[in-house]
């Protein structure tokens, strides 16, 4: 509940009373076993009031709230002072706010301004709705105190106002305030009095954005939320919020380890057909139809769920998938994430935008992971270096793996249509984010019920990630719901990156010496059979693929075969079929239990049932 008499116990204006109360609480916590004697004494020795006064003084000197970047910078510097110099919380805070430190940051003011402008530009959004953070405390006539929140407000609107479909979002601030006023009036009709009330309006859908220079690890800009920032150290959606990453995680947890450690190539194929694990059935994002054999390249380009799942199940294992995500800097995973769902970004806690974007920055940096850098050095008031923040790097992926993933993610952002029968192709998922006159690669992500949307991508210069969604997990679209749709974030990513790269030339992505090319069949991932793979009824299945040196396949395609068909029946020709009705045709060899797929439509037919060699009985009347 809310602290009794909070103004009297204000740690700034009522520090003495607060200290007495603090002492009582710490003693009670010790007596009830919540803390040890040593922890009690350590807490009592902490000069917390000096720290609070310093922060309060700093805030009063600068009435404009800190930016999201500064908020995170404060956290990073505080942790560095504690970890590297052994300072306590109090000492680090005192030094930071009143010690005259000189802190050098790689933030780019021009890029930061572009990010802030685009994230807050109403023209970039298809909706403007509002959620509320609401707190109300009442004293009832019988003297009892009761507390209310946005959740009780939502229930009241649904049940008392009869709006059963109300999802917690309002169409305007005025509409939200009217509902709050009506709610308060209803609650105080019995003579209850208001002890305290706070209302914060939050613009929805929300957004966070991170931009990193992958070659250095320098964080050039972040934005932790759409709308005016009204206070310091508020929720930073770029660094603090853990959200489900959706299909962006296919690259990190399934395809990256498959290529890097498991002998797979971009041409390795998995069968896109009905798939279940335990009691859970999986589907592709486009619906219930399946496409048959498809490569890892296709799995990335068209964000194919079944291909990613089979890759993790058959090649990688969930354990290795989690290990690779952690190698790429994801720190929020737990043991329960060692499941197939991780391949699709179904995580226990989720990930932060900062860590997800930096994982892709490692791919953009040739496989070298660099811990994100918010400051380069800290000097004391006399100019002496306290901390020289050297980059922490490690080789997370082979340079060949990084390039292969980059090449496939370039296809995501180019206009491509899946290799299928006419009229059933799926489009590449990132074309909306493509920026003009600059090489770019990236991956989209959308979570169940369209709750979260992501796009993380990079150029030869910068890696950027954007998250979109509602703070309280309302769907962005679905049925009659329209809370911003599922594409606005890609437009914002494109707008920001286009402006950031305006004066930069396009050097392209460097192909490392560890890469070679070869022609393969896209339906087997193996060397094509001359005249067979190229004559698939859907068009040639032969294409040129990149490989890590030494991994070009040596076997020939075993998913295509050439057969003779009877044109009269469409079946395999028999010895009895007329020669002039026999044609040669390429067909697919598919799994017997693979279900109905695009490939099964072109699979081996049964024998001709018209010309089967059966004896024909001719009656006398018929021969007359």
Regions found by a protein language model. Give the residues of each.
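Extracytoplasmic/secreted proteins, especially bacterial periplasmic and envelope-associated proteins
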Residues: 1, 17-30, 42, 64, ...
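Non-catalytic, structured segments within soluble enzyme domains
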Residues: 1-121, 125-150, 326, 331-332, ...
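Structured segments of extracytoplasmic/periplasmic soluble domains
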Residues: 2-6, 12, 25-33, 43-46, ...
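Second-shell loop/turn segments in exported
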Residues: 6-16, 25-26, 30, 54-62, ...
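Conserved catalytic neighborhood of penicillin-recognizing serine enzymes
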Residues: 56-62, 263-321, 369, 380-411
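A penicillin-recognizing enzyme superfamily signal
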Residues: 105-128, 132-143, 147-201, 205-213, ...
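Mid-domain, small-residue-enriched loop/turn segments at the edges of structured enzyme/sensor domains
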Residues: 281-285, 315-358
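Low-complexity, Gly/Ser/Thr/Pro-rich intrinsically disordered linker/tail segments
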Residues: 518-623
